[in-house]
């Protein structure tokens, strides 16, 4: 509903235009006046309800002052009171000292990778609000309950494709800062949209940890994964197939290429990439193996033998790639979504140095993922072709 021009003219009369949006300006005055108007209307309604229910007579009993934090300022409100003490306003509850948008603003800044000290400085510089680090931490800690609910939410029965990947995060643990792996599972649903299944901070080494993750996915309702794309970690494929025996485990081709280039001097990387392309672009597994042998015997394979050794170690989980038609291969190979996701996560943790504990790391990473979720609501163009091929290859499993 538009505000009448005459009313706006009255509000602006005699005011310096440059101060309208500043601290203690017209906007803050309006917030205060509207808030107090709402509080008085709430008390009137509360008293009317009590009278209609035949409750003992209750009436207004003066007011009290309360200083509250809004999203942009600090404001002292006159809170009306009732004699019986039964009035608890909805706008700003009895023991509440912050408007919800204030908490939302802090959480939004935290999700963008700002540290507690940076948020404190930002609120002071922009809004003139002095907020303690403890209060900021208390606000962001509210997210932990949402993290627990999200991490334990029910899953779909079947996911056509799940990418399992990891980033390294520095976390203080038992007095030492450790470089821990944080695993993320990005799933592609039958309609081509994406969903993060969960986040897990590595607590133990190897297969036992991954087996626990797989069992957790199953206990949350996931009964089948058609293709799992992993980054070549030893023991991970066995953990997946122990819980999901029908799952095809595929080594991530992009990770394998990157690992190969770690052995190559910078000036040689550009010509090595097309030489490797002949392997994973081969028409089938037999042709792929011949291309690997040709690379191994060629100039680059002789100069960097560790590359072909790496491909041979992972060959068992490279082979499934060749059995898929081009549409499915493209979806498996195109890791834009997981790469973009990891980029957001790394950017958020980079400014932190290290986290004081696992909960602090989970809190931030969850918020980053939550902000990115809007981008996954549309299926990529490639999914139209891939979906048909998934349905042909996997039949009824795809439609579960």
Swiss-Prot record:
Source species, domain of life: Bacteria
GO BP annotations, alphabetical order: DNA transposition
Membrane-spanning ranges: none
InterPro entries from the UniProt entry: Transposase_mutator
Family per record: Belongs to the transposase mutator family.
Family annotation (PANTHER family): MUTATOR FAMILY TRANSPOSASE (PTHR33217:SF5), TRANSPOSASE FOR INSERTION SEQUENCE ELEMENT IS1081 (PTHR33217)
Protein name, entry field: Probable transposase for insertion sequence element ISRM3-like
């Amino acid at each position: 509903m538009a505000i009448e021009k005459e009313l706006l003219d009255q509000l602006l009369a005699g005011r310096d235009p440059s101060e309208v949006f500043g601290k203690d300006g017209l906007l803050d005055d309006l917030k205060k006046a509207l808030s107090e108007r709402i509080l008085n209307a709430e008390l009137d309604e509360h008293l009317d309800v009590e009278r209609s229910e035949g409750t003992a007579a209750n009436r207004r009993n003066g007011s009290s002052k309360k200083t509250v934090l809004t999203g942009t300022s600090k404001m002292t409100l006159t809170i009306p009171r009732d004699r019986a003490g039964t009035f608890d306003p909805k706008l700003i509850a009895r023991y509440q000292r912050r408007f919800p948008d204030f908490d939302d603003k802090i959480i939004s800044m935290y999700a963008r990778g700002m540290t507690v000290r940076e948020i404190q400085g930002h609120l002071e510089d922009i809004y003139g609000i002095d907020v303690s680090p403890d209060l900021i931490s208390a606000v962001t800690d509210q997210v932990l309950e949402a993290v627990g609910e999200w991490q334990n939410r029910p899953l779909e029965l079947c996911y056509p494709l799940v990418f399992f990947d990891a980033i390294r995060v520095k976390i203080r643990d038992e007095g030492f800062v450790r470089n821990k792996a944080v695993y993320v599972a990005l799933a592609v649903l039958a309609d081509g949209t994406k969903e993060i299944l969960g986040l897990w901070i590595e607590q133990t080494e190897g297969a036992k940890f991954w087996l626990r993750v797989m069992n957790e996915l199953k206990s949350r309702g996931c009964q089948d994964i058609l293709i799992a794309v992993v980054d070549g970690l030893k023991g991970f494929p066995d953990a997946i197939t122990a819980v999901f025996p029908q799952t095809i485990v595929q080594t991530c081709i992009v990770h394998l290429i990157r690992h190969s280039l770690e052995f190559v001097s910078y000036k040689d990387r550009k010509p090595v990439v097309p030489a490797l392309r002949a392997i994973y672009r081969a028409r089938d597994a037999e042709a792929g193996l011949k291309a690997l042998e040709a690379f191994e015997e060629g100039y680059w394979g002789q100069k960097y033998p560790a590359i072909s050794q790496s491909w041979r170690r992972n060959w068992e989980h490279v082979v499934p790639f060749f059995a898929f038609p081009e549409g499915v291969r493209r979806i498996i190979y195109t890791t834009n979504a997981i790469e973009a996701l990891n980029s957001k996560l790394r950017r958020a943790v980079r400014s932190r140095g290290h986290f004081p504990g696992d909960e602090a790391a989970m809190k931030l990473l969850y918020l980053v993922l939550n902000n990115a979720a809007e981008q996954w609501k549309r299926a990529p163009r490639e999914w139209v072709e891939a979906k048909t091929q998934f349905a042909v290859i996997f039949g009824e499993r795809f439609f579960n």
